[in-house]
């Protein structure tokens, strides 16, 4: 897919246009007792998106499929038009919410065949997304993580420096210090203190090294020495009495819509789970993307005690495959934490009703739910989420119906989930390692 030469110019012109902002419906928190940060993921910009009478040529990401209902903010068979991404960031900028920082967990390029992209075009898309964020949020520290599509060929992120690693190291310099830039350039990962909260460290992992389709890391026990680096970094944070938020693209654990399928290779998943268990007192939260769905997980120790909260954020892109029945509405989210110990207090999930936005020609981003209010839990701590998971697992759980509706970001309230479907969801929420996950399936399937 050749990107037009005047692409960046077009982006900046679009940026000056008002995409139509929704009224933020989140509660106002005037007291400084609550800190906040945004999480955005899976932008998947498709620069070819345009409205045309030939619905097989609306976007490269539809791969020639007939796009039935294209509008200014996209279509479910297409990745994001720039106007959709801009509307998301404009909503964040004008939401009235004060945030200390933003995490951005990867995947800027579109889902298109390998031959339609190149290293240059992938870097160009990442550049344009970075420039958009930096222009809209010049004073906000942003912590990116690389996704499996943030490379060419897709998924093949290497164990040593590359053109993409070097390019993002230069692009993200305004947000990171020299040490972070150095490890990012070498292996696509880094750690960085939050400027406004110096005892909080962000660890941005390159979990794409552990992704099944990545042939560059086959038969390697510690690709790019990231495991060793991670343990050293967490040990240092433990000694220095820091708290850590772990961010990455591909999550730990099992996919909630598949059977016995970890999001990454089994060996690597077990290794990460082991590290996270040993340093659970340091890690105050884990945040991922990749699945395009809204889900949570609770990491437990080997005795079944909940020790870590894990959040997988839904995508901004609404894209789905032709044969898929369900997809997601575009979403972004805001986390609230307790300054000092960085305990996660709440999460506010915002979304765009894509059908409505296209009909009206304006984007009305609204609050989909506030986690504590939606589920009646005290906070986002592991014990609270473990209790919620137990509620979700009960027979005829109304809480689970709500959870499954939010899983697709309120895309389709009639989406069915039979007993097998529910079991896969519950087992994925509560079991991140092989032994406990398989035991869960044996007990419930």
Swiss-Prot record:
Source domain of life: Eukaryota
GO biological process, one term: negative regulation of cGAS/STING signaling pathway
Keywords: Disulfide bond, Glycoprotein, Hydrolase, Metal-binding, Secreted, Signal, Zinc
Keyword Secreted: yes
InterPro entries, per database record: ASM-like_Pdiesterase_prd, ASM_C, ASMase/PPN1_MPP, Calcineurin-like_PHP_ApaH, Metallo-depent_PP-like
Enzyme superclass (EC): hydrolase
Keyword Hydrolase: yes
Catalytic activity: 2',3'-cGAMP + H2O = 5'-pGpA(2'-5') + H(+); 5'-pGpA(2'-5') + H2O = 5'-GpA(2'-5') + phosphate; a ribonucleoside 5'-triphosphate + H2O = a ribonucleoside 5'-diphosphate + phosphate + H(+); ATP + H2O = ADP + phosphate + H(+)
Glycosylation sites: 66, 128, 219, 235, 353, 364
Gene Ontology CC: extracellular region; extracellular space
Example GO molecular function: zinc ion binding
Ligand binding (Zn(2+) 2): 107, 148, 249, 290
Entry's EC annotation: 3.1.4.-, 3.6.1.15
Cofactor: Zn(2+)
Positions of ATP binding: 111, 148-149
Subcellular location field: Secreted
Leader sequence segment: 1-22
Pfam families: ASMase_C, Metallophos
Family per similarity comment: Belongs to the acid sphingomyelinase family.
Role, per record: Cyclic-nucleotide phosphodiesterase that acts as a negative regulator of innate immunity by mediating degradation of 2',3'-cGAMP, thereby inhibiting the cGAS-STING signaling. Specifically linearizes 2',3'-cGAMP into 2'5'-bond pGpA and further hydrolyzes pGpA to produce GpA. Also has in vitro nucleotide phosphodiesterase activity with nucleoside triphosphates, such as ATP. Has in vitro activity with p-nitrophenyl-TMP. Has lower activity with nucleoside diphosphates, and no activity with nucleoside monophosphates. Has in vitro activity with CDP-choline, giving rise to CMP and phosphocholine.
Quaternary context: Monomer. Homodimer; homodimerizes following 2',3'-cGAMP-binding.
The name this protein goes by in its record: Cyclic GMP-AMP phosphodiesterase SMPDL3A
Protein source organism: Rattus norvegicus
Gene from which the chain derives: Smpdl3a
């Amino acid at each position: 897919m050749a990107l037009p030469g005047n692409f960046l110019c077009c982006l900046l012109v679009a940026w000056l246009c008002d995409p139509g902002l929704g009224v933020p419906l989140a509660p106002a928190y005037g007291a400084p007792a609550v800190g906040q940060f945004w999480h955005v993921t899976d932008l998947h910009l498709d620069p070819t998106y345009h409205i045309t009478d030939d619905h097989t040529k609306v976007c490269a990401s539809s791969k020639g499929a007939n796009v039935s209902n294209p509008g200014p903010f996209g279509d479910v068979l297409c990745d994001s038009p720039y106007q959709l991404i801009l509307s998301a960031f404009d909503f964040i900028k004008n939401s009235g919410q004060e945030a200390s920082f933003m995490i951005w967990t990867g995947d800027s390029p579109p889902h298109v065949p390998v031959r339609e992209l190149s290293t240059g075009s992938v870097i160009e898309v990442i550049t344009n997304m970075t420039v958009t964020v930096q222009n809209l949020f010049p004073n906000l520290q942003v912590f990116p993580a690389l996704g499996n599509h943030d490379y060419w060929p897709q998924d093949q992120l290497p164990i040593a420096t590359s053109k993409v690693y070097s390019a993002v190291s230069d692009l993200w310099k305004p947000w990171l210090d020299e040490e972070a830039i150095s490890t990012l350039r070498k292996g696509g990962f880094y750690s960085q203190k939050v400027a406004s909260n110096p005892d909080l460290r962000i660890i941005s992992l390159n979990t794409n090294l552990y992704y099944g389709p990545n042939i560059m890391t086959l038969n390697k026990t510690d690709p790019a020495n990231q495991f060793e680096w991670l343990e050293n970094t967490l040990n240092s944070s433990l000694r220095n009495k820091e708290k850590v938020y772990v961010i990455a693209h591909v999550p730990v654990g099992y996919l909630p819509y598949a059977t016995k399928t970890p999001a990454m290779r089994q060996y690597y998943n077990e290794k990460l789970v082991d590290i996270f268990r040993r340093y659970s007192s340091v890690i105050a939260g884990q945040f991922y993307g990749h699945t395009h769905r809204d889900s949570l997980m609770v990491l437990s120790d080997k005795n079944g005690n909940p020790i870590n909260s894990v959040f997988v954020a839904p995508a901004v892109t609404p894209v789905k495959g032709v044969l898929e029945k369900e997809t997601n509405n575009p979403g972004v989210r805001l986390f609230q934490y307790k300054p000092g110990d960085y305990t996660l207090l709440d999460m506010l999930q915002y979304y765009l009703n894509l059908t409505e936005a296209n009909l009206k020609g304006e984007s009305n981003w609204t609050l989909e739910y506030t986690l504590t209010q939606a589920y009646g839990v005290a906070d986002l701590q592991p014990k609270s989420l473990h209790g919620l998971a137990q509620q979700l697992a009960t027979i005829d759980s109304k809480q689970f119906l709500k959870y499954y509706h939010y899983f697709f970001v309120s895309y389709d309230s009639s989406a069915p989930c039979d007993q097998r479907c529910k079991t896969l969801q519950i087992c994925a929420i509560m079991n991140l390692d092989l032994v406990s996950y398989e035991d869960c399936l044996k007990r419930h399937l």
